[in-house]
Design a protein with these regions (language model features):
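Conserved N-terminal helical subregion
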Residues: 4-130, 168-185, 326-328
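Short helix-loop capping/hinge motifs at secondary-structure junctions, enriched
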Residues: 18-19, 39-40, 132-137, 169-170, ...
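Acidic/histidine metal-binding catalytic segments
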Residues: 23, 190-204, 263-268
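Short gly/ser/thr-rich secondary-structure transition/capping motifs
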Residues: 66-67, 81-82, 142-143, 205-214
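Conserved mid-domain beta->alpha element of the FAD-binding
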Residues: 99-100, 127, 150, 184, ...
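A short coil-to-beta-strand element that immediately follows conserved catalytic motifs
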Residues: 119-124, 136-137, 181-182, 193-208
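Active-site substrate-recognition segment that forms the wall
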Residues: 137-171, 177, 181, 185-190, ...
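Alpha-helical membrane-targeting segments
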Residues: 283, 287-322, 326-328
Length: 328
Protein backbone atom coordinates (compact mmCIF):
# COMPACT_ATOMS: atom_id res chain seq x y z
CA UNK A 1 0.00 0.00 0.00
CA UNK A 2 1.15 3.57 -0.62
CA UNK A 3 0.01 6.37 1.66
CA UNK A 4 0.24 9.89 0.24
CA UNK A 5 0.44 13.18 2.20
CA UNK A 6 -3.33 13.72 2.28
CA UNK A 7 -3.68 10.55 4.38
CA UNK A 8 -0.39 10.94 6.27
CA UNK A 9 -1.69 14.18 7.82
CA UNK A 10 -4.49 12.40 9.72
CA UNK A 11 -1.99 9.77 10.91
CA UNK A 12 0.23 12.61 12.14
CA UNK A 13 -2.71 14.20 13.98
CA UNK A 14 -3.44 10.85 15.61
CA UNK A 15 0.17 10.50 16.73
CA UNK A 16 0.90 7.32 14.77
CA UNK A 17 2.59 8.59 11.62
CA UNK A 18 6.17 8.30 12.92
CA UNK A 19 5.67 4.70 14.04
CA UNK A 20 4.16 3.84 10.66
CA UNK A 21 7.02 5.52 8.77
CA UNK A 22 9.61 3.69 10.89
CA UNK A 23 8.11 0.33 9.87
CA UNK A 24 7.81 1.29 6.20
CA UNK A 25 9.85 2.90 3.39
CA UNK A 26 10.01 6.46 2.10
CA UNK A 27 11.06 6.48 -1.58
CA UNK A 28 12.42 9.75 -2.94
CA UNK A 29 11.40 9.31 -6.57
CA UNK A 30 8.68 7.86 -8.76
CA UNK A 31 10.11 6.78 -12.12
CA UNK A 32 7.95 6.14 -15.21
CA UNK A 33 9.06 3.88 -18.07
CA UNK A 34 7.59 2.87 -21.40
CA UNK A 35 8.89 -0.28 -23.09
CA UNK A 36 12.07 -0.15 -21.03
CA UNK A 37 12.87 3.55 -21.53
CA UNK A 38 12.59 6.14 -18.77
CA UNK A 39 10.14 8.91 -19.65
CA UNK A 40 9.67 10.78 -16.37
CA UNK A 41 11.21 11.07 -12.90
CA UNK A 42 9.27 12.82 -10.15
CA UNK A 43 9.88 13.69 -6.51
CA UNK A 44 7.44 11.84 -4.32
CA UNK A 45 6.18 12.23 -0.77
CA UNK A 46 4.42 8.91 -0.26
CA UNK A 47 5.19 6.21 2.29
CA UNK A 48 5.19 2.69 0.89
CA UNK A 49 4.39 -0.20 3.18
CA UNK A 50 2.23 -3.28 3.65
CA UNK A 51 -1.36 -3.25 4.84
CA UNK A 52 -0.26 -5.48 7.70
CA UNK A 53 2.10 -2.80 9.04
CA UNK A 54 -0.53 -0.07 8.75
CA UNK A 55 -3.12 -2.17 10.55
CA UNK A 56 -0.60 -3.09 13.26
CA UNK A 57 0.10 0.57 14.01
CA UNK A 58 -3.58 1.56 14.06
CA UNK A 59 -4.52 -1.49 16.16
CA UNK A 60 -1.78 -0.83 18.70
CA UNK A 61 -2.91 2.76 19.15
CA UNK A 62 -6.60 1.83 19.31
CA UNK A 63 -6.10 -0.85 21.96
CA UNK A 64 -3.81 1.49 23.89
CA UNK A 65 -6.67 3.97 24.10
CA UNK A 66 -8.97 1.30 25.53
CA UNK A 67 -10.60 0.31 22.26
CA UNK A 68 -12.25 -3.09 22.02
CA UNK A 69 -12.37 -5.57 19.14
CA UNK A 70 -14.88 -8.42 19.18
CA UNK A 71 -13.39 -11.58 17.70
CA UNK A 72 -15.45 -14.54 16.45
CA UNK A 73 -18.26 -12.13 15.60
CA UNK A 74 -19.37 -12.40 11.98
CA UNK A 75 -21.95 -9.84 10.90
CA UNK A 76 -25.39 -11.25 10.12
CA UNK A 77 -27.90 -8.40 10.05
CA UNK A 78 -28.64 -4.88 11.16
CA UNK A 79 -31.98 -3.42 12.19
CA UNK A 80 -31.61 0.30 11.56
CA UNK A 81 -34.89 1.12 13.35
CA UNK A 82 -34.07 -0.64 16.63
CA UNK A 83 -30.32 0.03 16.24
CA UNK A 84 -29.47 -3.63 16.82
CA UNK A 85 -26.70 -5.65 15.17
CA UNK A 86 -26.98 -9.44 15.07
CA UNK A 87 -24.00 -11.75 14.56
CA UNK A 88 -23.86 -15.34 13.35
CA UNK A 89 -23.00 -16.49 16.89
CA UNK A 90 -26.46 -15.17 17.90
CA UNK A 91 -25.01 -12.28 19.88
CA UNK A 92 -27.08 -9.09 19.57
CA UNK A 93 -25.77 -5.60 20.35
CA UNK A 94 -27.75 -2.39 20.65
CA UNK A 95 -25.75 0.56 19.35
CA UNK A 96 -26.17 4.29 18.87
CA UNK A 97 -24.61 4.41 15.40
CA UNK A 98 -23.04 2.09 12.82
CA UNK A 99 -19.94 2.93 10.78
CA UNK A 100 -19.88 0.36 7.99
CA UNK A 101 -16.43 -0.08 6.50
CA UNK A 102 -16.95 -3.62 5.24
CA UNK A 103 -15.49 -3.34 1.76
CA UNK A 104 -16.76 -3.47 -1.80
CA UNK A 105 -19.06 -6.40 -0.96
CA UNK A 106 -20.55 -4.40 1.93
CA UNK A 107 -23.58 -6.10 3.44
CA UNK A 108 -24.62 -2.82 5.03
CA UNK A 109 -24.64 -1.10 1.64
CA UNK A 110 -26.46 -3.98 -0.03
CA UNK A 111 -29.19 -4.13 2.62
CA UNK A 112 -29.64 -0.46 3.50
CA UNK A 113 -28.71 1.35 0.27
CA UNK A 114 -30.79 -0.84 -2.08
CA UNK A 115 -30.55 1.30 -5.22
CA UNK A 116 -26.77 1.77 -5.06
CA UNK A 117 -25.82 -0.97 -7.54
CA UNK A 118 -23.81 -4.16 -7.21
CA UNK A 119 -20.07 -4.86 -7.73
CA UNK A 120 -19.16 -5.03 -11.42
CA UNK A 121 -15.95 -6.09 -13.13
CA UNK A 122 -13.96 -3.01 -14.16
CA UNK A 123 -12.20 -4.56 -17.16
CA UNK A 124 -8.90 -4.91 -15.29
CA UNK A 125 -7.28 -7.85 -13.55
CA UNK A 126 -4.20 -7.62 -11.35
CA UNK A 127 -1.34 -9.77 -10.18
CA UNK A 128 0.45 -9.08 -6.91
CA UNK A 129 3.12 -10.45 -4.64
CA UNK A 130 6.02 -9.49 -2.39
CA UNK A 131 9.60 -10.47 -3.20
CA UNK A 132 13.12 -9.19 -2.70
CA UNK A 133 14.92 -6.53 -4.72
CA UNK A 134 17.32 -3.62 -4.36
CA UNK A 135 15.09 -0.91 -5.83
CA UNK A 136 14.74 2.28 -3.78
CA UNK A 137 12.19 4.18 -5.88
CA UNK A 138 8.63 3.60 -7.04
CA UNK A 139 8.96 2.10 -10.51
CA UNK A 140 6.15 2.34 -13.07
CA UNK A 141 6.39 0.41 -16.35
CA UNK A 142 3.77 0.95 -19.05
CA UNK A 143 3.05 -1.27 -22.02
CA UNK A 144 0.19 -1.97 -24.44
CA UNK A 145 -2.88 -2.76 -22.31
CA UNK A 146 -0.74 -3.44 -19.25
CA UNK A 147 1.32 -1.76 -16.57
CA UNK A 148 3.56 -2.81 -13.68
CA UNK A 149 4.38 -0.95 -10.48
CA UNK A 150 7.08 -1.99 -8.01
CA UNK A 151 8.11 -0.33 -4.75
CA UNK A 152 10.06 -1.19 -1.58
CA UNK A 153 7.94 -1.63 1.56
CA UNK A 154 10.66 -1.79 4.22
CA UNK A 155 14.42 -1.47 4.71
CA UNK A 156 15.06 -5.21 4.36
CA UNK A 157 14.56 -5.29 0.59
CA UNK A 158 10.97 -6.55 0.60
CA UNK A 159 9.34 -5.21 -2.55
CA UNK A 160 5.71 -5.08 -3.60
CA UNK A 161 4.95 -5.79 -7.24
CA UNK A 162 1.61 -5.35 -8.97
CA UNK A 163 0.93 -6.08 -12.62
CA UNK A 164 -2.36 -4.99 -14.19
CA UNK A 165 -3.86 -6.30 -17.42
CA UNK A 166 -6.77 -4.80 -19.31
CA UNK A 167 -8.88 -7.80 -20.26
CA UNK A 168 -12.53 -8.71 -20.82
CA UNK A 169 -11.91 -12.04 -19.08
CA UNK A 170 -13.23 -11.38 -15.59
CA UNK A 171 -11.36 -12.81 -12.61
CA UNK A 172 -12.97 -13.30 -9.21
CA UNK A 173 -12.78 -10.40 -6.75
CA UNK A 174 -10.58 -12.07 -4.15
CA UNK A 175 -7.10 -11.40 -2.83
CA UNK A 176 -6.72 -15.04 -1.82
CA UNK A 177 -6.67 -16.75 -5.22
CA UNK A 178 -3.17 -17.95 -6.03
CA UNK A 179 -1.90 -17.73 -9.58
CA UNK A 180 1.10 -19.30 -11.26
CA UNK A 181 4.30 -17.45 -12.03
CA UNK A 182 4.19 -18.95 -15.52
CA UNK A 183 0.79 -17.37 -16.20
CA UNK A 184 2.02 -14.06 -14.80
CA UNK A 185 5.06 -14.12 -17.09
CA UNK A 186 2.82 -14.90 -20.06
CA UNK A 187 0.67 -11.83 -19.37
CA UNK A 188 3.82 -9.66 -19.27
CA UNK A 189 5.95 -11.43 -21.85
CA UNK A 190 6.67 -8.19 -23.72
CA UNK A 191 8.53 -6.75 -20.71
CA UNK A 192 12.14 -7.28 -19.76
CA UNK A 193 11.96 -9.87 -16.97
CA UNK A 194 14.51 -7.87 -14.97
CA UNK A 195 11.67 -5.43 -14.25
CA UNK A 196 9.96 -8.00 -12.05
CA UNK A 197 12.95 -9.99 -10.86
CA UNK A 198 11.43 -10.00 -7.36
CA UNK A 199 8.77 -12.44 -8.58
CA UNK A 200 11.25 -15.32 -8.33
CA UNK A 201 11.68 -14.69 -4.59
CA UNK A 202 7.98 -14.26 -3.86
CA UNK A 203 6.55 -17.20 -1.92
CA UNK A 204 3.18 -16.82 -3.62
CA UNK A 205 1.66 -14.75 -6.38
CA UNK A 206 -2.00 -13.82 -6.48
CA UNK A 207 -4.40 -12.75 -9.20
CA UNK A 208 -7.66 -10.94 -8.69
CA UNK A 209 -10.27 -9.03 -10.64
CA UNK A 210 -10.65 -5.32 -9.95
CA UNK A 211 -14.29 -4.48 -9.30
CA UNK A 212 -16.20 -1.21 -8.96
CA UNK A 213 -19.61 0.04 -7.86
CA UNK A 214 -21.54 3.13 -9.00
CA UNK A 215 -20.91 6.42 -7.24
CA UNK A 216 -23.31 7.10 -4.38
CA UNK A 217 -25.66 10.03 -4.00
CA UNK A 218 -25.51 9.61 -0.22
CA UNK A 219 -23.14 7.88 2.21
CA UNK A 220 -25.68 7.89 5.06
CA UNK A 221 -28.98 6.14 5.76
CA UNK A 222 -30.75 6.48 9.11
CA UNK A 223 -28.12 5.63 11.74
CA UNK A 224 -25.71 4.01 9.24
CA UNK A 225 -22.69 5.74 7.71
CA UNK A 226 -20.50 4.19 5.02
CA UNK A 227 -16.72 4.56 4.89
CA UNK A 228 -13.96 3.35 2.58
CA UNK A 229 -14.66 0.79 -0.13
CA UNK A 230 -18.17 0.24 1.22
CA UNK A 231 -18.92 3.79 0.07
CA UNK A 232 -16.59 4.35 -2.88
CA UNK A 233 -14.60 1.37 -4.19
CA UNK A 234 -12.19 2.62 -6.80
CA UNK A 235 -9.68 1.21 -9.22
CA UNK A 236 -6.16 1.55 -7.76
CA UNK A 237 -4.53 3.69 -10.46
CA UNK A 238 -4.12 6.81 -8.33
CA UNK A 239 -3.16 4.91 -5.18
CA UNK A 240 -6.02 6.51 -3.24
CA UNK A 241 -8.31 3.68 -2.08
CA UNK A 242 -6.74 3.30 1.37
CA UNK A 243 -6.08 7.04 1.60
CA UNK A 244 -9.76 7.86 1.09
CA UNK A 245 -10.73 5.39 3.84
CA UNK A 246 -8.31 7.13 6.23
CA UNK A 247 -9.72 10.52 5.26
CA UNK A 248 -13.28 9.24 5.79
CA UNK A 249 -12.56 7.82 9.24
CA UNK A 250 -10.64 10.86 10.43
CA UNK A 251 -13.35 13.22 9.19
CA UNK A 252 -16.12 11.32 10.95
CA UNK A 253 -14.10 11.11 14.16
CA UNK A 254 -13.26 14.81 14.21
CA UNK A 255 -16.87 15.81 13.55
CA UNK A 256 -18.15 13.42 16.22
CA UNK A 257 -15.79 14.94 18.76
CA UNK A 258 -16.70 18.51 17.89
CA UNK A 259 -20.44 17.83 17.88
CA UNK A 260 -20.60 15.67 20.99
CA UNK A 261 -21.51 12.53 19.02
CA UNK A 262 -24.76 14.10 17.86
CA UNK A 263 -24.86 11.92 14.75
CA UNK A 264 -27.89 13.70 13.30
CA UNK A 265 -25.60 16.70 12.94
CA UNK A 266 -22.46 14.72 12.12
CA UNK A 267 -23.86 12.82 9.13
CA UNK A 268 -24.83 15.76 6.87
CA UNK A 269 -21.52 17.51 7.53
CA UNK A 270 -19.57 14.30 6.92
CA UNK A 271 -21.38 13.80 3.64
CA UNK A 272 -20.87 17.42 2.60
CA UNK A 273 -17.12 17.12 3.20
CA UNK A 274 -16.55 13.63 1.79
CA UNK A 275 -19.04 12.76 -0.93
CA UNK A 276 -17.87 15.04 -3.73
CA UNK A 277 -14.17 14.40 -3.11
CA UNK A 278 -14.62 10.63 -3.00
CA UNK A 279 -16.73 10.54 -6.17
CA UNK A 280 -14.31 12.84 -7.99
CA UNK A 281 -11.28 10.69 -7.16
CA UNK A 282 -13.23 7.54 -7.95
CA UNK A 283 -13.89 8.95 -11.43
CA UNK A 284 -10.32 10.24 -11.86
CA UNK A 285 -8.95 6.80 -10.98
CA UNK A 286 -10.97 5.25 -13.81
CA UNK A 287 -9.62 7.85 -16.23
CA UNK A 288 -6.07 7.11 -15.08
CA UNK A 289 -6.69 3.44 -15.78
CA UNK A 290 -7.49 4.30 -19.40
CA UNK A 291 -4.30 6.37 -19.68
CA UNK A 292 -2.17 3.63 -18.12
CA UNK A 293 -3.34 0.93 -20.52
CA UNK A 294 -3.37 2.59 -23.94
CA UNK A 295 -2.76 0.09 -26.74
CA UNK A 296 -2.56 2.41 -29.75
CA UNK A 297 1.15 3.28 -30.17
CA UNK A 298 0.46 6.78 -31.54
CA UNK A 299 -1.81 7.64 -28.61
CA UNK A 300 0.71 6.10 -26.20
CA UNK A 301 3.46 8.25 -27.76
CA UNK A 302 1.34 11.37 -27.20
CA UNK A 303 0.68 10.38 -23.58
CA UNK A 304 4.38 9.77 -22.97
CA UNK A 305 5.27 13.11 -24.56
CA UNK A 306 2.86 14.95 -22.27
CA UNK A 307 4.15 13.07 -19.23
CA UNK A 308 7.75 13.80 -20.13
CA UNK A 309 7.55 17.46 -21.13
CA UNK A 310 4.69 18.97 -19.11
CA UNK A 311 3.95 19.32 -15.37
CA UNK A 312 0.59 17.55 -15.72
CA UNK A 313 1.55 14.62 -13.48
CA UNK A 314 2.86 16.85 -10.71
CA UNK A 315 -0.18 19.12 -10.94
CA UNK A 316 -2.58 16.19 -10.66
CA UNK A 317 -0.85 14.64 -7.65
CA UNK A 318 -0.48 17.98 -5.89
CA UNK A 319 -4.21 18.61 -6.22
CA UNK A 320 -4.92 15.31 -4.47
CA UNK A 321 -2.05 15.39 -1.97
CA UNK A 322 -2.48 19.00 -0.81
CA UNK A 323 -5.95 18.31 0.57
CA UNK A 324 -6.27 18.87 4.32
CA UNK A 325 -9.35 17.64 6.16
CA UNK A 326 -8.91 20.26 8.87
CA UNK A 327 -9.30 22.96 6.21
CA UNK A 328 -12.24 21.32 4.42
Amino acid sequence: ISISPNALRPLQKLGIKDDFVDRSFVPEKAVMHYQGKEIKRLDTEVVTSSRQKLIEVIHQSYVGLGGEILFEHEYKSLDADSCEITFTNNEVYKVSHVLACDGIKSSARQNHFPSSGVPAYSGYSAWRGIGLSEIKDIQFHFGPGTHIVNYPIDHEGRTSFVGVVKTNEATEDSWKIKGSKEAFLEDFKFYDEEIFSMVSSSEDIYKWGIYIRPSLNSMCSKNITLLGDAAHPMVPFLGQGGCMAIEDAYTFGILSGKLGCDFNKVQPLYEKIRLQRNNRIQSASMLQGKLNHIKNPIVAFTRNLLMSHTPLLAMRTEKIWNYSIDEA
